[in-house]
Amino acid sequence: MPTRPCASRRTVLRGAAAAPVAGLGLAACAAPDGSAAAAPTAPVELGEETEVAKGGAQLYRDHNVVVSRDQDGTLKAYSTICTHAGCPINKLEGTTLICPCHGSRFDAVTGKVVQAPATEQLTELSVKAANGRIVAGPAD
């Protein structure tokens, strides 16, 4: 019966050094309490209506919501919990949301997937402007 070669000391030490780094990568994708709400469960006030320009988007990290405004002035809101692995999306470049865990990209104006690995679009939320403030909540 053939014998397996013993792992060198260097190989063992490399593996031991890499294990904590891999764990940090997984921890970076998790919500602080271990679970992130995919959408507000009640209406939440996000900010001033003027924060979202026509053709632009604003990310509200504390509420896991992105709000965009089309050229006609219509507001749209989406949950910023990635549909691939449930990671909170914390980066907005122009109108593109970028998930830090696996690189999925979403259009903040339509909620549609722009780049895999995600295959499902973001969850749409209800949104309105009330007294100059943006209020988002569960879909109607």
Predicted segment positions?
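Short cysteine/histidine-rich metal-coordination sites, predominantly Zn2+-binding motifs
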Residues: T96-G103, V113-L122
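Functionally engaged cysteine thiol sites
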Residues: C6, C87, C101
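Alpha-helical protein-protein interaction elements
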Residues: A16-V21, V52, I98, V114
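N-terminal secretory signal peptides and thylakoid transit peptides that target proteins
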Residues: M1-G25
